[in-house]
């Protein structure tokens, strides 16, 4: 028999992420991380697409900044979202959160390998770098876009979770 829903509380227990305002704040923080990563990648892709080889010296610093940004985002979503869902949500949501967490780790490893692959980038590597950079950042953008949609869904249905 389904539990009766009374506003934000099911069976006398608060929702997983707290009140709607807390879920909204988590969602906004995740959206901010994704938007910032997108901005960083878009600026770098514009430089690479314009074949501005003379800007090659900037890319190492920018790659490490983006890598650090992705690391902060990973810590945020794992601790603030995925771990809570895995610990307290129904089985179907746990499966989703576990899969998202594993995929996130794999994606982070992929980006770290990309970052490390181009340490000490030289102008004679430009053609290979350009292709790798465009493919990697496009894949990362598509992945974080899909992930933020899934995070929105986890947060939206979290009002139904009870400990």
Place the predicted regions along the sequence by residue.
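Small-residue-biased structural context
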Residues: 1-163
């Amino acid at each position: 028999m389904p539990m009766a829903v009374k506003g934000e509380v099911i069976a006398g227990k608060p929702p997983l992420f707290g009140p709607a305002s807390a879920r909204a704040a988590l969602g906004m923080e995740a959206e901010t991380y994704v938007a910032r990563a997108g901005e960083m990648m878009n600026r770098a892709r514009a430089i690479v697409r314009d074949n501005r080889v003379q800007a090659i010296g900037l890319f190492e610093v920018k790659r490490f900044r983006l890598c650090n940004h992705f690391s902060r985002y990973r810590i945020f979503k794992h601790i603030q979202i995925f771990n809570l869902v895995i610990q307290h949500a129904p089985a179907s949501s746990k499966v989703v959160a576990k899969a998202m967490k594993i995929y996130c780790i794999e994606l982070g490893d992929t980006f770290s390998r990309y970052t490390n692959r181009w340490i000490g980038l030289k102008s004679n590597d430009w053609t290979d770098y350009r292709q790798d950079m465009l493919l990697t950042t496009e894949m990362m953008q598509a992945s974080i876009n899909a992930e933020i949609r899934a995070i929105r869904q986890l947060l939206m249905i979290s009002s139904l979770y009870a400990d």
